[in-house]
């Protein structure tokens, strides 16, 4: 198979294989994209919840990033689980070192079973320093509420929350609407020039573990191949569907 591009994935490992680094690698590979990884934490989990989180020392996360990218230059970066301020600071340092412009942030905060995966201090640092470094942020509804303080009950609230996120410096926002209990799912892409609503039918399935990881990596893969962010979001959503 011909490799279309290369991406670096900075995220946690999921022992069940459905989410995290494992889902990221599978997604990139299916789309013909070469995936490098920097593991931020090892999680013991399954589709029902997280049993434990074993953090990787921040310096070793930094070393994974710098050592791999000195040899293989990524076209884009996808960032997932960053559980502490020390980890975020090391990732910020590595981003400054690499100066890569195409960066997608999936702000993983709460596991499907309800386990919290990030400290409150790390959330504040993400808002203050990391969001302004990325091209696109892809929160689900609970994550968007945590980041903005906005209670989201409808599409208009999603758009308002997206504009609140842009106040932290990120230029493009994709808020995922899958947590609404509606028959149709609305994902909303927002930047200063436009608002695009992607609407799809909800599938009657319990196999939703890792859909956020899969989507953000699919978007990163398409973006790394030269597609625009809006088109990458459209193609990524279609891929997950």
Which residues fall in each region the model found?
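Conserved N-terminal subdomain of the carbohydrate kinase-like
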Residues: 2-9, 23, 28-112, 116
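Short pre-catalytic strand/loop immediately N-terminal to key active-site residues, enriched for Gly-Thr
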Residues: 10-16, 195-209
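Short, small-residue alpha-helix embedded
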Residues: 22, 27, 146, 205-229
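Phosphate-handling active-site elements
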Residues: 31-36, 196, 222-236
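Glycine-rich beta-alpha junction loops
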Residues: 42-43, 83, 109-111, 178-180, ...
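Conserved phosphate/ATP/ADP-binding segment of small-molecule kinases
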Residues: 120-195
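Short, well-structured alpha-helical segments that form the helix of a local strand-helix-strand
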Residues: 158-166, 228-241
């Amino acid at each position: 198979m011909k490799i279309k591009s290369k991406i670096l994935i900075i995220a946690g490992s999921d022992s069940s294989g459905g989410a995290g680094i494992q889902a990221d690698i599978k997604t990139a590979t299916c789309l013909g994209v070469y995936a490098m990884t920097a593991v931020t934490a090892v999680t013991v989990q399954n589709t029902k919840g997280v049993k434990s989180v074993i953090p990787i020392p921040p310096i070793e996360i930094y070393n994974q990033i710098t050592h791999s990218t000195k040899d293989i230059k990524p076209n884009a970066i996808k960032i997932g689980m960053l559980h502490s301020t020390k980890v975020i600071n090391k990732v910020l340092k590595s981003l400054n070192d690499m100066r890569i412009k195409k960066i997608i942030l999936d702000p993983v905060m709460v596991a499907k079973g309800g386990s919290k995966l990030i400290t409150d201090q790390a959330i504040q640092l993400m808002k203050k320093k990391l969001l302004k470094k990325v091209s696109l942020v892809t929160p689900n509804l609970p994550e968007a509420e945590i980041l903005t303080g906005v209670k989201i009950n409808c599409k208009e609230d999603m758009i308002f929350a997206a504009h609140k996120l842009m106040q932290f410096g990120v230029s493009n926002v994709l808020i995922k609407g899958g947590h609404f209990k509606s028959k149709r799912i609305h994902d909303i892409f927002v930047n200063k020039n436009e608002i695009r609503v992607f609407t799809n039918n909800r599938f009657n399935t319990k196999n939703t573990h890792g859909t956020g990881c899969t989507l953000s990596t699919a978007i990163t893969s398409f973006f790394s191949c030269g597609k625009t962010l809006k088109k990458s979001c459209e193609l990524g959503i279609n891929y997950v569907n």
